[in-house]
């Protein structure tokens, strides 16, 4: 029994010893092998200009626009406007039946002549004391009341006409001749598109960055690939107490405004003063970990490392990856503007292949076009 136990102990010790010797030999073999490198792409950071922008959304509106509706109930007697017709201020577009009002006006005008003659006769008789002043005043009051009644009837007739409030373009007429309409019935929309505008709202924190005449660039889903230029023409002098935002209006350049329709949703970019000598890198150069944003720089090999790799044909392309923490100030398209001194002009920043490396990794700089560092030639809806 003791012999068997001794044999098992010897076998166990032998296995442990063999594995230890094997591990040492493998470690020596690995240590003697040249360090492998990971391929990466990179670019040298150059000073660039950067134009910060404020991104927001807005709604396009005309210079003037109104949905015309009736002030009185009645039957439509005439429709004088066509769908899409250009109209002038004061032009009659639709007229309601006013035959009763016109008949009343004729009767009132006929009575006015008799009342005028009575009043004039009483004025002459007053001088000869044939009538009292009270009788003359009553005659004058009757005459004045009739004049006012006539003016009221004329106004009532005019209110039965729907006229263009300004020069513009009519939309789709919503009523027909003979149709009975009630007060407030929508008739037709008229819009003055001579100067198209866009209304939007911004945080009050951006108020100091705005000024009249500031350039605004707009895009719409209805016209993909096109941009429309405008300038800020009005800034609300008070903050909206319910939203905490300030209302702003911009006016489109004439050549761009006629391409837009009222009510269009638009995405806006408000250009701020250009900043020079900025550190700008492709966004693909920035990675993320649990502590925030990171990037990798190419660090030259030490002289000692170069000596050990003197026989490597890739030596002039080999670097050490240095992991740094970066802080993004702004992003536009495929580029990011960095703040702080972690990345300086002249540094070589890795733009591809970061997934397989860590701080201090040996990397090979593959000089080729960088995917994700160039804006696409044509934008798509996606």
Curated annotation (Swiss-Prot):
Cited NCBIfam families: RND_mfp
Species per Swiss-Prot/TrEMBL record: Haemophilus influenzae (strain ATCC 51907 / DSM 11121 / KW20 / Rd)
Principal location: membrane
A GO CC term attached to the entry: efflux pump complex
Family per similarity comment: Belongs to the membrane fusion protein (MFP) (TC 8.A.1) family.
Domain of life: Bacteria
Alphabetical UniProt keywords: Membrane, Transmembrane, Transmembrane helix
Membrane-spanning residues: 1-21
Membrane topology: Single-pass membrane protein
Pfam entry (one): HlyD_D23
GO molecular function: efflux transmembrane transporter activity
Protein name: Uncharacterized protein HI_0894
């Amino acid at each position: 029994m003791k012999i068997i136990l001794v044999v098992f102990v010897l076998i166990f010790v032998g296995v442990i010893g063999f594995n230890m010797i094997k591990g040492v030999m493998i470690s020596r073999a690995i240590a003697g092998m040249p360090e492998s490198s990971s391929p990466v792409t990179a670019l040298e950071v150059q000073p660039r200009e950067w134009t910060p922008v404020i991104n927001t959304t807005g709604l396009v509106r005309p210079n003037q626009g109104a949905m015309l509706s009736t002030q009185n109930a009645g039957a439509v007697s005439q429709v004088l406007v066509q769908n899409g017709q250009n109209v002038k201020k004061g032009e009659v577009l639709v007229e309601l039946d006013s035959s009763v009002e016109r008949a009343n006006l004729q009767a009132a005008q006929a009575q006015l002549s008799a009342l005028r003659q009575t009043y004039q006769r009483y004025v002459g008789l007053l001088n000869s004391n044939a009538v009292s002043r009270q009788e003359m005043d009553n005659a004058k009051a009757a005459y004045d009341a009739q004049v006012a009644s006539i003016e009221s009837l004329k106004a009532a007739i005019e209110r039965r006409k729907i006229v263009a409030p300004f020069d513009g373009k009519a939309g789709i007429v919503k009523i027909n001749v003979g149709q009975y309409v009630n007060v407030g019935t929508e008739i037709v929309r008229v819009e003055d598109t001579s100067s198209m505008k866009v209304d939007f709202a911004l945080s009050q924190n951006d108020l100091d960055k705005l000024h009249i005449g500031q350039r605004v660039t707009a895009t719409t889903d209805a016209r993909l690939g096109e941009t429309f230029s405008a300038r800020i023409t009005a800034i609300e002098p008070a903050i909206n107490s319910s939203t905490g935002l300030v209302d702003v209006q911009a006016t489109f350049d004439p050549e761009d405004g006629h391409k837009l329709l009222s009510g269009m949703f638009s995405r806006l970019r408000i250009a701020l003063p250009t900043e020079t000598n900025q550190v700008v890198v492709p966004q693909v150069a920035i990675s993320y970990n649990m502590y925030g944003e990171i990037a990798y720089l190419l660090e030259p090999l030490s002289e000692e490392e170069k000596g050990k790799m003197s026989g490597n044909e890739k030596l002039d392309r080999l670097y050490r990856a240095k992991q740094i923490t970066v802080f993004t100030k702004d992003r536009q398209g495929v580029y990011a503007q960095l703040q702080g001194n972690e990345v300086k002009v002249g540094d070589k920043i890795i733009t591809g292949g970061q997934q397989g490396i860590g701080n201090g990794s040996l990397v090979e700089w593959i000089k080729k076009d960088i995917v994700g560092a160039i804006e696409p030639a044509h934008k798509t809806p996606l």
